[in-house]
From Swiss-Prot:
Name this protein carries in UniProt: UPF0329 protein ECU05_1650
Family: Belongs to the UPF0329 family.
Listed Pfam families: DUF3654
InterPro entries linked to this entry: DUF3654
Amino acid sequence: MSLIMEAHSEHLCLRMIRLNADEMEEPLLHYMSYERLVNTYERYKSIGIVAEIAKRVFVETRILMTKVSTAQCMKPGREKRWKGSVRRRSLENFRLRGGIQWYSHACRGMAIGLQN
């Protein structure tokens, strides 16, 4: 856990030096596992490199998530298809309800006819 805290504090120092307005601070554990941090530290023997890699993972993941959400929102025809499927389901429900109402009226009519 101390390695994570050290890497995170180094990451914060790097952020203070190179502050980017688009970045938002979130825990590094959301993006990198503990094993990955340890392996990186053992490979490079530098907490600064671990922090820089963590920073890059954080920034690239943030940018990627933004691009994906923007692409999904801006995909042509998505809203039209969604509205069409909602309309189709509501029409099916209306027809189903109408069919049930017609069936209940027919049964009532037959019951009244049988009583007479």
